[in-house]
Amino acid sequence: MGQKINPNGFRLGVIHDWESKWYADKGYKETLNEDLRIRKFISKKLKDASVSTVEIERAANRINISIHTAKPGMVIGKGGSEVEALRKQLNALTDKQVHINIVEIKKPDLDAELVADSIARQLEARIAFRRAMRQATQRAMRAGAKGIKVQTSGRLNGADMARREWHTEGRVPLQTLRADIDYAWVNAFTTYGEIGVQVWINRGEILPTRKNKPASKPTKGGNR
């Protein structure tokens, strides 16, 4: 099962959290579509800012958006001008009060979304796919990854037949729920067609915290 399902969804509620946090008694479809519009708008607006994840929280008529990026300076702008302009645009898009929080990604080489996007951009620039995969795995291992797997599929190097190639280093245990596996799939649009890039990164194990039980008090009169 761990080999087929999305590793991020497989670990939801265990070691990974949801990217949208809200509850709706009614109007669920409209709220979900609004989340999709927000993410699409931010992805298009900040396509060169190395944005990995957009988390959305809702409370009453307020939307809190956390943008995880490896280039916070580009998102914020001089004196906060860029992020303020983005906030006003999202206010107009949603007709709600929007608050934006910028979260810096300290190690972009351990973020599957950013690694996959980097490989896809290299493929679009006609870089050899094996070289792009090898360099990505080497950077991830140097950054502290326990393992990484990169897969590309499509008409690689303009071949007539579509095929699949992958490069792996270290361990990537997909069925171990405590293993912090980050996964992403990005498409590269080349002159030969669309090439899919998938990345799995093992960032180590997250052990569940043990809750200490309070010591039981002795019963009145002692043991009998």
UniProtKB/Swiss-Prot annotation:
Does the record carry Ribonucleoprotein as a key word?
yes
Known SUPFAM superfamilies for this protein? Prokaryotic type KH domain (KH-domain type II) (SSF54814), Ribosomal protein S3 C-terminal domain (SSF54821)
Q: Which domain of life is it from?
A: Bacteria
Any single biological process term in GO: translation
Q: Looking at the keywords, is Ribonucleoprotein present? A: yes
| Protein family according to the UniProt entry | Belongs to the universal ribosomal protein uS3 family.
Write down the HAMAP family for this protein, in alphabetical order.
Answer: Ribosomal_uS3_B (MF_01309_B)
- The protein's assembly and partners: Part of the 30S ribosomal subunit. Forms a tight complex with proteins S10 and S14.
Q: What is this protein called?
A: Small ribosomal subunit protein uS3
